[in-house]
């Protein structure tokens, strides 16, 4: 299990206490974080290069650029599939942190940078763990596991020093009440010290969890360390149960139970946290993590509660369209695909429903497979499995542009019939069935049009090629894949003017509609 959801969120505790409420600074960092949340890490790195070269960039932001570049590289590494590439990216991140602390040793974020160094080292330990799991590295498995343990020990040493420092700072404040109105600076200082002390405790507990991952699942050392980590998380939760950090500790206590096979205890904790009344963005992020972990439990062989996974995952994706591309969104979509494939393969599923459910699983697996990261390989295998079952029914995919383009045009015309069917549906059950049918049909239309674009060559009519792009963009719009719609339509609007000016205006309108839809679907 990757650590990044926890690592990223816990990192925010200290950062939030250090960044002042200067609007200009918030503007730069908020935009940067938005790019990273969407997994546009290459664009985020380009943005950092751009503002680094811009003389108008505030001094406070200029100083933070090496630090933010390191954070971006660390997040980027989580989307890479090859351990060697991940290791190289993480080393670049460490170099940027070293540059930051060298250039600005007295910067308020210098301490945070050192803590983040420990977290990057933990990420490197996970990379070694991935190497140990590789079939090609089985002869070196023990060596990779030992290397991972050494890296965890290095990270623990960094976190222990931070713990000692933050504990001392925290204990320097009296345990008595501090009036926020009368002593605002003192109140804020103690609150900041408490957050840093809590984060240090979480980091140490995370080291114990990470060390468990360096042993084979189910082994005595694996279970021993997971039990120890669960106890450490429990103590943190007991101390900070009313704070976000304490709630995250509770969630990771549940994760430790889950990985020991104690699904009942894990689900009890996840359900408890999902029922938390909080509405803040931090609590929402916590609940999203808990939902993903809950779906993993429900998909387990011991539970096989596939229909419940489908219901809960589809509900989350419907309510969080703009977040489907995030790490959490990809994880939830992957659990949805797993549940759909498993449900379709159950003997109790009617044959008439099997093909429909398999095609839904196929669409979700393809969506996840479009992103770099931990789900790419497993989703590729799923796509292959499902295709092997349903490919023969359709006679295979088109083998030339003209056939694929013509099929895409025909399917685009048929979409209206399915939309009318949805509009005419009376009962909620009929509406849901019609919506599923429409979505599935449009996903297949998009796939056919993508095949057409891949089959295009230098003999393809430029007008037909741009029209195929336009149809694909329009299909994306109907699927509410707004970013894909806007980017592709904007490309057509700019390129088609030289070929067929009549389509460029329509494409420009479609691009604007895509951006507007993306804005309307974004969290308010």
PLM feature spans:
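Positively charged n-region of N-terminal signal peptides that target proteins for export
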Residues: 1-6
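Bacterial N-terminal signal peptides
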Residues: 7-18
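Acidic, polar-rich low-complexity tracts and alpha-helical solenoid repeat scaffolds
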Residues: 21-524
């Amino acid at each position: 299990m990757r650590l990044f959801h926890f690592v990223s969120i816990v990192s925010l505790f200290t950062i939030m206490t250090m960044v002042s409420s200067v609007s200009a600074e918030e503007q730069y960092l908020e935009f940067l974080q938005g790019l990273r949340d969407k997994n546009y890490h290459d664009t985020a790195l380009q943005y950092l290069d751009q503002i680094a070269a811009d003389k108008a960039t505030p001094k406070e932001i200029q100083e933070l650029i090496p630090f933010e570049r390191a954070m971006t590289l660390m997040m980027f590494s989580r989307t890479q599939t090859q351990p060697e590439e991940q290791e190289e990216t993480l080393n670049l991140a460490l170099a940027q942190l070293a540059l930051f602390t060298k250039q600005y040793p007295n910067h308020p974020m210098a301490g945070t940078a050192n803590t983040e160094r420990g977290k990057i080292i933990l990420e490197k330990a996970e990379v070694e763990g991935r190497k140990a799991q590789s079939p090609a590295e089985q002869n070196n498995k023990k060596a990779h596991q030992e290397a991972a343990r050494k890296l965890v020990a290095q990270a623990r040493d960094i976190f222990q020093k931070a713990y000692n420092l933050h504990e001392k700072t925290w204990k320097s404040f009296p345990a008595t009440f501090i009036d926020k109105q009368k002593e605002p600076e003192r109140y804020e200082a103690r609150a900041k010290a408490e957050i840093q002390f809590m984060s240090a405790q979480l980091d140490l507990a995370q080291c114990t969890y990470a060390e468990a991952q360096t042993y084979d699942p189910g082994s005595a050392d694996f279970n021993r360390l997971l039990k120890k980590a669960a106890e450490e998380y429990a103590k943190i939760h007991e101390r900070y149960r009313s704070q976000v950090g304490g709630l995250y500790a509770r969630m990771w206590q549940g994760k430790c139970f889950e990985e020991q096979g104690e699904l009942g205890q894990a689900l009890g904790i996840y359900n408890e946290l999902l029922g938390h009344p909080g509405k803040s963005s931090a609590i929402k992020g916590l609940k999203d993590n808990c939902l993903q972990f809950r779906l993993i439990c429900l998909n387990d062989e011991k539970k096989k509660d596939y229909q419940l996974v489908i219901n809960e995952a589809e509900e989350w994706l419907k309510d969080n369209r703009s977040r489907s591309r995030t790490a959490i969104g990809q994880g939830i979509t992957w659990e949805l695909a797993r549940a759909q494939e498993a449900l379709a393969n159950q003997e109790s599923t009617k044959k008439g429903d099997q093909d429909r459910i398999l095609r839904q699983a196929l669409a979700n697996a393809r969506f996840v497979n479009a992103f770099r990261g931990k789900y790419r390989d497993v989703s590729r295998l799923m796509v292959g499995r499902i295709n092997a079952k349903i490919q023969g029914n359709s006679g295979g995919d088109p083998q030339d542009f003209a056939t694929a383009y013509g099929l895409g045009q025909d399917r685009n015309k048929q979409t209206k019939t399915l939309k009318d069917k949805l509009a005419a549906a009376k009962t909620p059950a009929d509406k849901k069935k019609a919506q599923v049918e429409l979505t599935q049909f449009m996903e297949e239309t998009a796939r056919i049009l993508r095949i057409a674009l891949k089959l295009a060559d230098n003999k393809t009519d430029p007008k037909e090629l741009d029209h195929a792009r336009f149809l694909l963009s329009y299909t994306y719009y109907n699927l509410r894949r707004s970013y894909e719609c806007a980017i592709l339509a904007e490309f057509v609007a700019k390129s088609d003017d030289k070929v067929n000016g009549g389509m460029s205006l329509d494409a420009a309108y479609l691009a604007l509609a895509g951006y507007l839809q993306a804005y309307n679907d974004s969290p308010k």
